């Protein structure tokens, strides 16, 4: 029996709701999608709950689920994945945080949680922090530049805990929070104290940085604080190949996703021009996926632009991103050959563009196979048509479904 290559494409934050600017259509409905439409006659579509109905997924928990790992068992917090994706080498017991370069006033009140989002000087600021803040109370501190305004912070040493609260207030106009222990332990208390010392030291370094003085002179907001959240102890995950028997690779420019994929043992590629934002080079990502499909059984292609547009409330940009993803799908199918692969297209969660945040809505999902199946006979691929389809699954079902339709699944039982 022929075994097919597997291509999984995730448009981050794909799912949506009717949008007033689109006369009640969703962005997926409004988008022109000729390549996807061409696949429908040999496809099943439907809805996926990344975690379970009504649960609002993070991008971390949803991807774990989609890759076949129950987040209730394996999730330890986002910080470790962000750090791995940003290039950190972690060892058991390290505590990692995800963070934002942000702008605060002299009273540490947050003015901009993302310091304007685009931060070309991020590498310079990370280098300066690593040179000037190396250790606090015998605990080693390391900073790693992530995508755009994002940064990861890793603590290494004895007697530290991830059971501490965030310093990120999550809203502008609020003061940077004091980290507090989340359990009654010496380790949690010690770690919270270290984080609070770190917050003040980071502000002192960044507020006097020549980089930020230049930004102010150029009319830009200074990146003068790092807001921390998502503390996580590093605990190694099983490799993707160990439970799927697949040789796997991933294309992504987003630190979190790269971190998860690296931890799962996938070969992670970030092509030149891939940014993890709206301005990403879609063609470069398509070419990378095509090359990886030559040598791998499974290729995962992650595109962040849909989610970035949603969080910023950019309706037209989300529609354009979907249309560009459709071209990516067409390019890959034309080059690899529609008879040689199965293709799944979905989102890791819904981010309604008028809400600007993740929601617990189910996400539309499409599965194309190159051989005769009972297709769903739908006119389009969108949230409304998906309700007519045959698929009604959880994220945890995705990997098994892909193994089955690629003729790679093993029988369960005698």
Swiss-Prot record:
Molecular function (Gene Ontology), one example: metal ion binding
Superkingdom classification of source: Archaea
Gene Ontology process terms (BP): glycolytic process
Stored CDD domains: iPGM_like (cd16011)
Catalytic reactions on record: (2R)-2-phosphoglycerate = (2R)-3-phosphoglycerate
Top-level EC class: isomerase
Enzyme Commission number(s) from the entry: 5.4.2.12
InterPro entries reported for this sequence: Alkaline_phosphatase_core_sf, ApgAM_prokaryotes, Metalloenzyme, Pglycerate_mutase_ApgM, Pglycerate_mutase_ApgM_sf
Pathway: Carbohydrate degradation; glycolysis; pyruvate from D-glyceraldehyde 3-phosphate: step 3/5
Keyword entries, A-Z: Glycolysis, Isomerase
Function as written in the Swiss-Prot or TrEMBL entry: Catalyzes the interconversion of 2-phosphoglycerate and 3-phosphoglycerate.
Protein family membership: Belongs to the BPG-independent phosphoglycerate mutase family. A-PGAM subfamily.
Protein name from the UniProt record: 2,3-bisphosphoglycerate-independent phosphoglycerate mutase
